[in-house]
Amino acid sequence: MAQKLWEKNVRVNEEIDRFTVGRDREMDLYLAKHDVLGSMAHITMLESIGLLTAGELEMLLAELKNIYASAEKGEFVIEDGIEDVHSQVELMLTRKLGDVGKKIHSGRSRNDQVLVDLKLFTRAELKEVAEEVEQLFHVLISQSNTYKDVLMPGYTHLQIAMPSSFGLWFGAYAESLVDDMMFLQAAFKMCNRNPLGSAAGYGSSFPLDREMTTRLLGFDSMDYNVVYAQMGRGKMERNVAFALASIAGTVSKMAFDACMFSSQNFGFVKLPDECTTGSSIMPHKKNPDVFELTRAKCNKLQALPQQIMMIMNNLPSGYFRDLQIIKEVFLPAFRELKECLQMAAYIMDKIKINEHILDDNRYLYIFSVEEVNRLASEGMPFRDAYKKVGLDIEAGKFTHDKKVHHTHEGSIGNLCNDRIESLMRQVVDGFNFSVMEQAERSLLGR
C-alpha cells in the first residue's frame, strides 16, 4: 500500500483505511481538473512570495498542464492505495520533478484544497445548469407564443375551474424558471468566493497573498475569515442544493402535468413517440416513461438539501470527516439535473397540442365565471350574478359562446412573455461567467 501524505511510523489497518477512504477516490475524479487549477494558482502565488523559484514554478506549471489535459480527456486515474486526488497530483509531480513536486503543499492543507476544488467544480457546473435552464426556458417561451390563442381548461383541486390557454401553461413554467435562476445566481455568488489560504481552517504563518489567488482563479472575492472559510464546507453545498432543488421542483411539476394531460382521460397533448414505451401485454400502450423518470429524478433532487443538512447536523466549527460524505450525494446531482433539463427541453419542443379541447361540452362550466363577469359588467351586483349563473347550471340552462376576452397583464390575451424574457436576460447577465472563464484560460495559457 502506498504511503499516505500524513503517515508517520504507524502502519494503517487496511480495513480501517477502506472504511475511511470510502468512495473518496471515485468522487475525487469529479474534482481532478479543478484540483490542478487550484494548484496552479497556489504555486504561482508561492513563487511571488519567495517559496518557489521562477524555474521551479515553470516546471510545475508545465507538468500541471499535462495533468490537466489528461483529466480533461478522462484519462486521469487515482492509483490503488492513493486516498484522494490531492495525493495523486502531488505524487505525479514528485515522480516527474523530484523534490520540487513536494513543495506545492507549502501554506496549504487538504482542507482548503478540497474547499477550492469544490467551489471551482460547483461554479463550472452551475454555468452548465444555467445554460440548460436557459435552453428549456426558450423552448417554453416559443411554445407559449405559438399556442397563445389555444384554450384549455384550468383546474383547481383537479376540478375544472376557469379558461386557461397553452400560452399560459407553457409561459407559467418559463417564468418559474426565471425565479429558479435567481435562486441559482444567489447560490453562484455565495460559491464564487476564494477559500484558498485558510489552510486547515486557521490560516498560515507564511505570508500568503490571498488576493492574488482570488484574482488568478477569477473569484469575485474571498472567504475572508479563515475559520468561516472552513465553516462554509457543507453550507455552500447546501445553498447550491436548494437552488438545484428549486429547478427540479419546476421540472417535476411540468413533467407531472404533461404525463396527466397526455393520458386518454385528458387527451390535451401528445408526447413524442420516441419518449414513450410500450407494454409487454397491452398493445395500445404508450407510456410516458421519460417524463415519469424525469419526475422521479427531480423529486430525488428535491431531497438533496435535506440530505446535506442531516450530514452536517450539529457539527461545531472546524473540519470533520463527516463532510466527506456530502460529496457522494452532491457531486453527481448536477449531471442528473442537466439530463432532466435536456429531456424536458426535447419533449416540450416536440409535444403536440390538441387545439379543440373545449369543443367537448364537459368543459362548458369553465365559462361560468365569464358569464358572471359579463352580467356584473352590465350592472348586476356580482353576488346576484353569481347566484343566477349557479341556478342556471343546476337547472341545466347554462350556455356560453366559449370565448374569452382577458386583457390585463399576464392573462390569456396579454401573456407578457416579452417581459418574462427580459427578466431572464437580466438574471443570465448577472452571473458574469466570463470572468471565471477568462481566469481559467489565463492559468492554462489558452
Curated annotation (Swiss-Prot):
This is Argininosuccinate lyase. Belongs to the lyase 1 family. Argininosuccinate lyase subfamily. Keywords: Amino-acid biosynthesis, Arginine biosynthesis, Cytoplasm, Lyase. CDD domains: Argininosuccinate_lyase. NCBIfam families: argH (TIGR00838). It is found in: Cytoplasm. It catalyses: 2-(N(omega)-L-arginino)succinate = fumarate + L-arginine. Disulfide bonds: none annotated.
